[in-house]
């Protein structure tokens, strides 16, 4: 009965994502609508879709798993770097990119670069598109694979079948609704991710014996609760965190300035003045979400200390939220539905990244390579058909 409730919750979630795509299927009249939502995105959707598409399942699996094993230093400095990178990206890049891309009527990042630097031969268009395709197609495929692995590990469902179903859902709402569907589903997925973090955190603290017990356990472990050292679980010792470690860990935040699927959100907002509000929303959510994720890792270890959760070594530490969700599901039907929502949050984290990267890769093929570099003359209807066909091929 528990598994049925969990699976039903996840199925309802997936169907809802498809319905969003169908709801926006009639709103795409040209390439600008399909790839940028007609530049009519509001500040909330812009902010939350950008951050949801950035975080991926790493927020709900990798980060709490790292905190569970090593303490707060490594995930903490990573979070600081990512928060700074997020804020600076919105502050420095967003307004200029929105203004210039609108003036140049550019709807993709490679096209913007080509027009901005007067590339008459469209070499920047082609090069940028190839780079996006080379790196985003495998990344998107890994997202589909992650969805398949999640269903297989939880319910014993055939891996290939689960992956194909997940891919069909993501491709389905992307191909029908385009950018509007992707950003709207990303907003919904960010909410589901947030609810998952809150639910796991509240239950976990109770199962660990309370917040004081969680902190006391963390304090008893060498290097666990300091930003200047990491905990070595195998040896039970602390390893100092050098300046080089700090800088290299924080450097993750530098990647934001070159992420096409995030930059497209800047180009799509309805008014550049609203980017200030978007920046505040995005920065606050990122800080809160990553802080909660790190604390969940610490709470998970507290649950292990209290005997509520087995010790998770190595890569199994990344399943700490999944294990907690399974414990929640044992407390009745409503609890099983909540557990399904938590697992849907992990699925949402993966889907929100995969759909955005798939759309960016598809736009690179149909818009930058075929039309700009290849000089194919297509009507708006033909261009939309090429865009949708490219998504299927990607």
Q: Across the structure, where does each feature detected by a protein language model lie?
A:
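Residue-level recognition of pore/gate-forming positions within transmembrane alpha-helices
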Residues: 14-17, 53-54, 82-86, 129-133, ...
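Helix-loop-helix module between adjacent transmembrane segments
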Residues: 77-174, 251-255, 346-356
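Loop-to-transmembrane helix boundary motifs in multi-pass membrane proteins
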Residues: 116-126, 133, 363-394
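Membrane-interface "cap" regions at the ends of multi-pass membrane proteins
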Residues: 1-61, 174-177, 190
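Helix-loop junctions at the membrane interface of multi-pass solute transporters
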Residues: 24-25, 33-38, 51, 65-69, ...
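Hydrophobic alpha-helical transmembrane segments
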Residues: 3, 7-11, 47-48, 76-80, ...
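Loop-to-helix junctions at membrane interfaces in multi-pass transport proteins
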Residues: 1-2, 39-41, 45, 62-79, ...
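Extracellular loop-to-transmembrane helix junctions
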Residues: 2-24, 67-107, 111, 193, ...
């Amino acid at each position: 009965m528990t598994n049925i409730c969990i699976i039903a919750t996840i199925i309802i979630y997936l169907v809802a994502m498809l319905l969003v795509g169908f709801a926006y299927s009639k709103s795409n009249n040209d390439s600008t609508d399909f790839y940028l939502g007609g530049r009519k995105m509001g500040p909330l959707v812009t902010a939350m879709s950008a951050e949801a598409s950035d975080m991926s399942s790493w927020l709900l699996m990798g980060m709490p798993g790292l905190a569970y094993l090593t303490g707060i230093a490594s995930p903490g400095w990573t979070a600081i770097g990512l928060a700074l990178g997020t804020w600076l990206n919105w502050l420095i890049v967003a307004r200029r990119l929105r203004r210039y891309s609108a003036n140049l009527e550019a709807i993709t990042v490679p096209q913007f670069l080509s027009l901005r630097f007067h590339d008459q031969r469209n070499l920047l268009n082609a090069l940028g598109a190839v780079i996006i395709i080379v790196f985003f197609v495998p990344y998107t495929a890994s997202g589909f694979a992650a969805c398949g692995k999640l269903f297989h590990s939880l319910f014993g469902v055939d891996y290939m079948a689960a992956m194909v179903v997940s891919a069909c859902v993501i491709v389905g709402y992307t191909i029908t609704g385009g950018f509007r569907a992707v950003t709207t589903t990303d907003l919904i997925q960010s909410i589901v991710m947030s609810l998952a973090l809150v639910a796991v955190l509240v239950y976990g603290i109770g199962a660990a014996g309370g917040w004081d017990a969680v902190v006391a356990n963390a304090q008893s472990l060498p290097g666990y609760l300091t930003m200047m050292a990491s905990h070595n679980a195998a040896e039970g010792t602390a390893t100092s965190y050098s300046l080089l470690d700090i800088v290299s860990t924080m450097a993750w935040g530098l990647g934001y300035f070159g992420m096409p699927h995030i930059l497209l959100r800047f180009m799509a907002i309805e008014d550049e003045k609203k980017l200030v509000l978007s920046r505040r929303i995005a920065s606050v959510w990122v800080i809160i979400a990553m802080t909660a994720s790190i604390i969940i890792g610490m709470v998970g270890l507290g649950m292990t200390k209290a005997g509520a959760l087995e010790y998770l070594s190595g890569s199994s530490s990344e399943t700490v939220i999944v294990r907690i969700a399974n414990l929640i599901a044992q407390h009745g039907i409503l609890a099983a539905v909540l557990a399904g929502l938590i697992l849907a949050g992990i699925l949402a984290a993966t889907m929100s990244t995969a759909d955005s990267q798939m759309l960016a890769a598809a736009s690179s093929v149909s818009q930058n390579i075929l039309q700009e570099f290849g000089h194919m003359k297509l009507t708006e209807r033909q261009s939309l058909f090429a865009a949708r066909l490219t998504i299927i091929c990607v």
